[in-house]
């Protein structure tokens, strides 16, 4: 029997409490504490002390379950898995089996990250667009409970002959027969393409320069920087022979990018790499997508024991934080939960906490293996073989603000490293401990590991609201005050750390309300306030006000301790120069990020955050993925 503490309801704000009631609690549950206790009992594997500890972690907001776990039990067919990664194999059986699998997954509440491995149109194939149109339509065909419709993303290699058509599927205008407005899209980008972009962006400016000792010295330094990079190897010896005099002709050769039919291996067309890259950047600016998956970076990080089995990563998932091997026999499974960094100081050295969280997700995974229908045999095979889980985080920006640390400062970088190094080291120990107690995953035989992967940082915007209105994932707050509409009414939400500061600084209630009104009028920004110091204004910068390179470098630093990926979104002003946007994207690849999620803009942000409308009765109003919440 779990001992429930109703006083922990005070940890919710009004919006978080209402969101939990509207979207996750069962009709016969009168308190959020009952919901947490139910989840703890379901996934404790009959270990009552574990159930009590899991309840305590959730009710104290240390641990956030993913959405399918949080809503578990509301429907008979639901399974506690957030997202699935099927691979669309280029055979008749592969096409049929994947369609059946995806339909089943949509009905049980899973988001889809589809790897597209089929050929361009020929005498036997209609190409990718007609197939993807069926998936686009099915997004609206399956309603998952009361809160959302199905949601899919498709990933295509950047060398596929239909890549340009694929990039146009979500853009405004054009033939409606080639539009996929319900289907998110992502692009697999290899190092070979990014090296071309890096070379061209580094050396192209010299083409227009007059030869002189200064420019030739700068040119040689630029070439040396490229040659010395870890991305360049034996195949790039030609860089040593690049000449200033013949640079234009040499760069024309570099700029050639072959589009290759994956079925025949034949080059179907050659286009300019720079034009394709610019199309990707502009499409992201216009639509927020495609997501970018640097597939070679992901595969380099794949554990050697899985490489030895001939496995490889072919795509990411709906929210770009999961990178696991897939093929015609494996549909990767996302089994997620998040640690609330707002409480990092309380649980960071609690060894039992890490063991319990990993055990909890292992139990969730086993429940899926035991209860999944036969249609999901590929997903069950993947889950059983690698037992991958994704322990993530939320509340990073909130934690920094609680310490009055500016997210762009050196202390923030040091805290970032400390947090994720601490989590990783504890989980490595737990992986071996559970491997000894419960046995190695089949993929991991000989390593002592229970899990092939243990960490992935999901976007978890909804979870952050429920978990005490903390900041989502590792993203900054988008505004310090915003209004959110739900089916139960409107809520004005305040940054809790700023609220505490203003209550201390401005005792008069009416004066304080005038300050909040002023913040609201400035799109949630505090940069205009005379009542705050320069340092305090830095601490409470909103996402649009933060240098995106700082966010990329923070993500790159923590990636060293994350064995999967992160849902890393970037914000740019609508009038931002494309050269700056290119620079940030290039830096993300150079510094080892595996994926980029959404491209945000102020136009979207103003609507999305200062007046954030999410009427949960209408799935069309939910722009962000909720499957990986956790």
From Swiss-Prot:
It comes from the Viruses. The keyword Repressor does not apply. It catalyses: a 2'-deoxyribonucleoside 5'-diphosphate + [thioredoxin]-disulfide + H2O = a ribonucleoside 5'-diphosphate + [thioredoxin]-dithiol. The record marks 90, 119 as: Allosteric effector binding. Substrate binds at residues 67, 82-83, 111, 317-321, 459-463. The active site is at 317 (proton acceptor), 319 (cysteine radical intermediate), 321 (proton acceptor). Under complex allosteric control mediated by deoxynucleoside triphosphates and ATP binding. The type of nucleotide bound at the specificity site determines substrate preference. It seems probable that ATP makes the enzyme reduce CDP and UDP, dGTP favors ADP reduction and dTTP favors GDP reduction. Disulfide bonds join 83-334. GO terms for biological process: deoxyribonucleotide biosynthetic process. The record marks 83, 334 as: Important for hydrogen atom transfer. Its EC number is 1.17.4.1. The record marks 597-598 as: Important for electron transfer. InterPro entries: RNR_lg_C, RNR_lsu_N, RNR_R1-su_N, Rrm1. GO terms for molecular function: ATP binding; ribonucleoside-diphosphate reductase activity, thioredoxin disulfide as acceptor. The keyword Thylakoid does not apply. Keywords: Deoxyribonucleotide synthesis, Disulfide bond, Oxidoreductase. Heterotetramer composed of a homodimer of the large subunit (R1) and a homodimer of the small subunit (R2). Larger multisubunit protein complex are also active, composed of (R1)n(R2)n. Ribonucleoside-diphosphate reductase holoenzyme provides the precursors necessary for viral DNA synthesis. Allows virus growth in non-dividing cells. Catalyzes the biosynthesis of deoxyribonucleotides from the corresponding ribonucleotides. This is Ribonucleoside-diphosphate reductase large subunit.
